[in-house]
């Protein structure tokens, strides 16, 4: 959950957070990623100076304990990595078994993987092939950080490249172009499968030219992607009227799951069966028949994306008052949702009453104490 929150605060729109094993990820998304970063669990020898209690952990679970875990993670990461892609493997240990030895055995199993040259910061050291039996000279391209030579603790990292054509069509790119998966069936979104309505194609996928779009209405009169309508309900359509033409999303991008409006980062077909923590951008929620934009949406926008907005300076006391959840006053006479920005950067929402009073809508869990 902490990772999902950090991505929300960063305004990330195209990220998916799962709680899955590397093996299941590789089974679901083979050769899907162009970049893979492994922060491998390790014996932690490089952390002894900062946290002496790590010595007890090392005595209980030394390098021999972590080697099979790291081997399995590397194997699944290889399966996840697309041809022409790059992978970083890193640890916080000095152990050659977990560092150069791990990479040497991985390269022996996968001759299509090679070590890349990287630019070293001052004080960074090269890998130590002489520390293992049969170590290849290419292991010197690895990076070691020793606390007596560089600012920091003890670390190891290596950049690996997978041979192949990065532009080679894979199943996912074909699905993006045609809207049809490898099984010949049309790719649907989560809401299609749950019956709550959805987009016809992936939000960020390329739209194939000349393909007829299906009717935007269901037989029962519901709009796709927006679910049931109720008379007098404030729907997202009214909110979209305040979006400028520069906004990176439209009403058609929305799908709905129960009372939550989403912009999915991936088709649910692609991640079906995975334990999901976060599947994309939470656009907003239906609160007692009224649409409320999310805090994540505000942070994912630029100030020019929304017409009704105010821009405070960092020195303005109202910026702090807003972060504390207080009502603020301004010369903004708009009614409805107002985007609150500080020095040009969106921070969250208020709701105007048309007389300059802005009711605070900053997420309660994020407010300053």
Task: Report the location of each language-model feature.
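Mobile active-site "lid"/loop adjacent to the S-adenosyl-L-methionine
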Residues: 34-75, 92-99
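S-adenosyl-L-methionine
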Residues: 1-30
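Conserved beta-strand signature within the Rossmann-like core of class I S-adenosyl-L-methionine
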Residues: 86-90
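Helix-to-beta-strand junctions that scaffold the AdoMet/dcAdoMet cofactor pocket
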Residues: 81-83
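Conserved Class I S-adenosyl-L-methionine
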Residues: 100-123
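Core SAM-dependent methyltransferase catalytic element
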Residues: 141-170, 174
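Polybasic, low-complexity RNA-engagement segments
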Residues: 163-369
